[in-house]
Amino acid sequence: MKQDETKALDREIGDYVAENTKVIWVDNHTMQIATMMIDSYGDTVYVWVEEAEDHCRVSDGGRILFKLDPNSEDEELNETAKEIAIGSGYQFDDDHFEIYVDVDRKNVAQAALKLAQLQVAISYLG
């Protein structure tokens, strides 16, 4: 009985995520994902996926730090966000304040959801 309940709950969680996550193509190589995550401002968290020949780049497009510090003046905030991103297994572009990771196609969903969670956490720094 417990195993059936666990499997049912697994399906329900998967269904919920699928129903509350929207993916659109913005061009021939880039997807925009509106995740089910909500940041500290109450806004939907977005993730972008750019397809390349041998990998996909999953990124925030530099948007979370732009939202927190539009003029890029808060060096401590940017450095803290960078440390958190790198510590979470992501890369950080110092020029564009973009958080990203390059992954195989099979790992895009996992990387996108983890990046959305990371953006939520970083949003509370502001």
Give residue ranges: language-model regions:
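N-terminal ordered "arm"
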Residues: 2-59
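Solvent-exposed, charged helical/coil patches
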Residues: 97-126
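Short glycine-rich, low-complexity/disordered patches
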Residues: 22-33, 91-98, 124-126
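Intrinsically disordered, low-complexity regulatory segments enriched in Ser/Thr/Pro
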Residues: 45-82, 89-98
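Generic hydrophobic, helix-prone segments enriched in Leu/Val/Ile
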Residues: 12-13, 80-86, 112, 119
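Secondary-structure transition/turn motif
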Residues: 34-39, 59-67, 101-106
